[in-house]
Amino acid sequence: MLLAGVVHREYDPPTALAAAVLCILLGNPYAVRSLSFQLSVGSVAGILAFSQRIFRYFREKYFPKQKFARKCLAYLYGSVSVTMGASVFSVPLCALYFGEVSLIGFLTNLLGLWAVSFAFYGILLSVLLGAIWLPLGKIAAFLTSLLLRYFIALVRLLSAFPLAAVYTRSLPIALWLGFSGMLLAVFLWHRRRPVVYAGACALALAIAVAFSWLTPLGENYRVTVLDVGQGQCVVLQSAGRTYLVDCGGSTGQKSADAAMEYLYSIGIFRIDGMILTHPDADHVNGAALLTGRMPIGETYGIADTDVLITQRTEIIFADCKITIFPGLTSGTDNEKSLSVLFQPGKRAILITGDQTVAGENALVAAGLPNLDYLVVGHHGSDTSTGETLLSATRPLCAVISVGANNRYGHPDQTVLDRLAAYGCTVLRTDQNGTIIIRG
């Protein structure tokens, strides 16, 4: 914009955006792969392409004669049109990269955009006044901080609502997002009857959410082995109750995000209990983050938990039973790892954490039923899933929670051959993604 005035040329927003993008990419061509670059360019492109048209549409529909009302509505229309324009390209990018779509973004921008605008000028003023006289700059900075605190409090308040965002890991939500995109394209082409399009979009969202939330209620049980990279996080559901076995992965953020997004996507906003098999990071590094995000009942583990497991412990509800077996009393953390047997009705699913062959032998001696599913111990390491366990339990299917191209070489080929010899169907999170077992 400034350069156009200097060289006496007409300012053209799309050309200016293209020039800015060109300058950035000339300096660093790899910036095109940066999410922040894509979101910034996409948001500005959406504002330039659509916001003015949306603003004109609102203004033509209703614009009062009273001066004060006109100013208020001009601000409202401006905030709405900028938010809608920026969302055209930013929402698909967020869905693609983060797997979620914010439903409070529109309201947050409407209530908080003014504070951000004033805070920007307040920061500049604070710097200038501070350069002249520091105490005066501090006063301006304090007043500016009130705006920022308001905005942060607003975001925290709105994001606490259960439907603050929807997650594309749910197929109905992903289909709704595609349907909404098609509706938007049709509306931008015809520019007629926006209420009909908005209503259709809202109705489709309600149907998608209802389908996502109600589907698990029609199942006797569900076991979900989340794809958390090199780690483990398993969700056990039955009879309206939800338990989590471990919450760890390649990073704590990834495992906590995966657990929360999955549970929210199916309408679960509270975990009845969390069982931490042992304190290795790839099994627990997301537990603290998840605890801070959603209410969790009792935690079970071998250290620093509500319930310390030193002997066989049973959790019984409806026709389900969760049995927690203690590990060996001495040795490494892996050898002390808890094992969890989930028995919804006549089914049996065993999770052995990082238990070793010696610990598995102790489990077999304690008494195990034939298994429908085995969540393979230690991500498929050759220190676990021994002959004794497999011959005693005869699992029909083995699930391996493992990260792609991990540096440990998991799962070990010896273990895969052993499972094949016992006729187990093998599913892996590095190949199949999140694995859901329903019954």
Each language-model region and where it sits:
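Stable alpha-helical elements in mature extracytoplasmic
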Residues: 121, 255, 259, 267, ...
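Membrane-interface amphipathic/re-entrant loop segments adjacent to transmembrane helices
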Residues: 95-111, 121-179, 184
